[in-house]
Swiss-Prot record:
The gene is hlh-25. Residues 106-149 are annotated as: Helix-loop-helix motif. It is found in: Nucleus. One of its GO terms (cellular component) is nucleus. One of its GO terms (molecular function) is protein dimerization activity. This is Helix-loop-helix protein 25.
Length: 268
């Protein structure tokens, strides 16, 4: 009889978590996200020496694209007071660390939610990308949008990023600023507004472009209603002659004796 090898829980625990396929996929996803965040950082940072966190990068990206300032929703006093304090016990330090991590995740979640709403509202990206908008997909769509639509960005954002967008030089940006804004042609500009008198007196046209029927002025007359009272029945009865046929009302003939009997009954 062959020997059956029974597996125990110790066999599964022998493999560390950082070597499992799930941890490898999470690590790969984290590295791609960090690369995209660094690319966003090169767009929104004011100088190369400026050191900003991922939350600040996302705040500036959201303000650059949508114009919404999410950073004002969070107060910076909470973290500064907690870092200045000296905690005696390890539990207090751990509590402050968890609170700081919650605030950091809340900031990132709000930024990604705002960018996701912007993508869905503008119908950006492909249909397959919009079905499952993960953080990597959101950052890829937003970076591509910034590079190809630098003219549509909000003017209140950082002006230093314009030379960095899509590899454009400062000369092209200056030439674009010197260009005159294109005016929108409307229908009313194609057809000038002319009055009827100007069209009639136009020397170039032999016949008027617009013709209107000449309606004479009818003077208002006052008439007495009572003087024409006799004509009113004839006015209303005349049309009825053509509509209703002439009807003869037939009444039964009564004899003189019956009439006398009726009068006697009334007298009695």
């Amino acid at each position: 009889m062959p020997k059956v090898i029974q597996s125990s829980m110790s066999d599964y625990r022998s493999v560390p978590y950082n070597q499992t396929p799930k941890s490898a996929s999470e690590r790969k996803r984290r590295n791609i996200t960090n690369e995209l965040i660094n690319e966003c950082k090169t767009i929104v940072q004011k100088s190369e020496e400026e050191h900003i966190s991922q939350e600040v990068v996302l705040f500036r990206i959201v303000k650059l694209v949508t114009g919404v300032n999410l950073e004002s929703n969070f107060s910076s006093n909470d973290l500064s007071e907690s870092t200045r304090r000296k905690f005696d016990t390890e539990s207090e330090r751990r509590k402050v660390k968890t609170e700081r991590e919650k605030i950091r995740r809340k900031k990132q979640d709000d930024c990604y939610a705002e960018l996701k709403f912007f993508i869905l509202n503008k119908q950006m990206g492909s249909y397959e990308q919009r079905l499952k908008l993960e953080r990597i997909t959101i950052l890829e769509i937003i970076i591509d949008y910034i590079k190809h639509n630098s003219d549509l960005l909000y003017p209140e954002t950082i002006p230093q990023i314009l030379p960095l967008l899509a590899g454009k030089s400062t000369a092209t940006c200056e030439n674009k600023e010197n260009e005159k804004p294109k005016t929108r042609m409307e229908v009313k500009d194609l057809f000038p507004r002319l009055t009827f008198q100007e069209v009639q007196e136009s020397p170039t046209s032999t016949s008027p472009l617009l013709t209107f029927p000449c309606i004479p002025m009818i003077p208002t007359t006052q008439f007495n209603v009572l003087s024409n009272y006799n004509t009113v029945p004839s006015i209303f009865s005349a049309p009825l002659r053509f509509i209703l046929p002439s009807l003869q009302i037939l009444t039964p003939e009564t004899s003189d004796e019956e009439e006398n009997e009726e009068t006697l009954d009334i007298i009695n």
